[in-house]
Amino acid sequence: MAVEKVKTKSIAANREARHEYFVIEALECGISLVGTEVKSLREGKVNLKDSWVDVEDGELIVKGMHISPYDMGNIFNRDPVRPRKLLAHKKEIRHLAQQIKLQGYTLVPLSLYFKCGRVRMELGLCKRSEERR
């Protein structure tokens, strides 16, 4: 039997993050969204440029990510920049929280993509790169 390739479709990438930060560790996690947000993502209407991730009460929360309202969504549309919960294992969250607290690292969204029909986010545990002037 042949091994099936996992289909991934890129939605958005945070190119500035790779320029401004040095990525130490990358992590894939899911994201909790509502239906109209997913439809808007399929159209590619998302901006990761000014987003960051916080650890609050043992949960990963992405803030500052802008998902434009879906055109046909009317009353079901949500606030475009509302905080969204990321889905990861508790052990991974504890590890990331410890790295942020002890080392002073930052969690930054690197990319957003569909994997097997589900929205996934690639997070980067980053350290701000020094200016080279």
In which residue ranges do the predicted regions lie?
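A short beta-strand motif that forms the metal-chelation/ATP-contact edge
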Residues: 119-127
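Intrinsically disordered, Lys/Arg-rich N-terminal extensions and targeting peptides
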Residues: 1-34
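Extended, positively charged loop/linker patches that create polyanion-binding surfaces
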Residues: 41, 46-114
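Helical mechanochemical/support elements of P-loop NTPase systems and associated helical scaffolds
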Residues: 19, 34-37, 89-92
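Conserved small/polar residues in nucleotide/adenosyl-binding loops
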Residues: 131-132
